[in-house]
């Protein structure tokens, strides 16, 4: 049984931009509801749980697509491509193209400043994926994800999509109220024309990750990427 809760404007936008008609429209409305709105309207549900689900569905869809599309690429390369495709700036940009921010519900203090914030839009994109998965199953979510992000996959493989892992790590720590991480050169080896550097990234004296590179900047980016891996910051 269809659950109709969307206003005509959001319903028309959904059909045109998302290319999907929800059986349970409350799922899409939840995906478009920011925490600040839910705090002011106790009966509304914020999109955080759908974001949690959508993040996993999105990662799985892209991982499976990469596995099938590039059978000869090693795990490390597949991981880098996936990271470039599902990173916050990439998802936020697709959300802008789709107009997701214009149809979100915000609290009074967040409506102006939050509507175009990368983190907000990226989270909402993931929440929409979660809503599609619950309403239409994996096929609906997969169709949407590959339609919106499929072109980015090849661009990322060719190195045309760059991920600034240092900025991502710093922003993640800042959202937790923490100071910026510190980078230290650990190893410098090899002849001048084949120099290799190993850098460690530290937070409050604790090593978060290490990375090798042909120069210090490259090594710092790899160290930050390692620090962002789930096994490095799950605690």
From Swiss-Prot:
Entry-linked Pfam families: dsrm, Ribonucleas_3_3
Cellular localization per UniProt: Cytoplasm
Top-rank taxon, per record: Bacteria
Keyword annotations of the record: Cytoplasm, Endonuclease, Hydrolase, Magnesium, Metal-binding, mRNA processing, Nuclease, RNA-binding, rRNA processing, rRNA-binding, tRNA processing
Any one GO molecular-function label of the UniProt entry: double-stranded RNA binding
One BP annotation, GO: rRNA processing
Subunit structure: Homodimer.
Name recorded for this polypeptide: Ribonuclease 3
Organism: Symbiobacterium thermophilum (strain DSM 24528 / JCM 14929 / IAM 14863 / T)
Species lineage: Bacteria, Bacillati, Bacillota, Clostridia, Eubacteriales
